[in-house]
Regions:
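Periplasmic c-type cytochrome electron-transfer domains
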Residues: 2-74, 94, 108-115, 131-141
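Soluble periplasmic/extracytoplasmic beta-strand elements of cell-envelope proteins
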Residues: 104-106
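Glycine-rich, acidic and aromatic/proline-enriched surface loops and short helix-turn segments
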Residues: 122
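Periplasmic/extracellular electron-transfer cofactor-ligation site
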Residues: 73-100, 125-131
């Protein structure tokens, strides 16, 4: 009985703290003020795990096809360089102001292809990463 009572009290306290945090606006929503380390880690871990779970069963096409590489390079130059940069481009107006900062893909190296495809297709909420799959067929992503 003590366990149930303690669990209910702790659960209720957690709900009150969470509701108070939301109601009193304790988490700053502005992109010009970074999250606390704890909030950033929670968001980052949640995002990474959610993408991994959803990308786990994707079948990745042969990424060594020269035509696919050429098409991908053109799409990247047209739609991605402004935020994710390219070799020889250190920063842009857009890459300087986004929070969280988009990864510099020229320095990051090759990401997991299935996860990269999922992110490009579906985007990431509240990050500035567009869901390109809403107006591009999978063959172009």
């Amino acid at each position: 009985m003590n366990f149930i009572k303690s669990s209910l009290i702790l659960g209720g306290a957690g709900l009150l703290i969470g509701a108070g945090t939301i109601y009193f606006g304790l988490i700053h929503p502005g992109a010009d003020e970074p999250h606390s380390a704890l909030v950033f880690k929670l968001i980052e871990t949640t995002r990474d795990r959610a993408i991994a779970v959803r990308a786990d069963d994707l079948v990745v096409p042969a990424l060594t096809d020269p035509a696919m590489i050429k098409q991908g390079a053109g799409n990247y130059a047209a739609m991605c360089v402004g935020c994710h940069l390219a070799p020889g481009i250190e920063s842009t107006e857009m890459s300087k102001i986004l929070y969280p900062a988009p990864p510099n893909l020229a320095k990051l190296g090759a990401p997991d292809p299935a996860r990269a495809f999922w992110v490009i297709k579906h985007g990431v909420k509240a990050s500035g990463m567009a869901a390109w799959g809403t107006n591009m067929k999978d063959d172009y992503i």
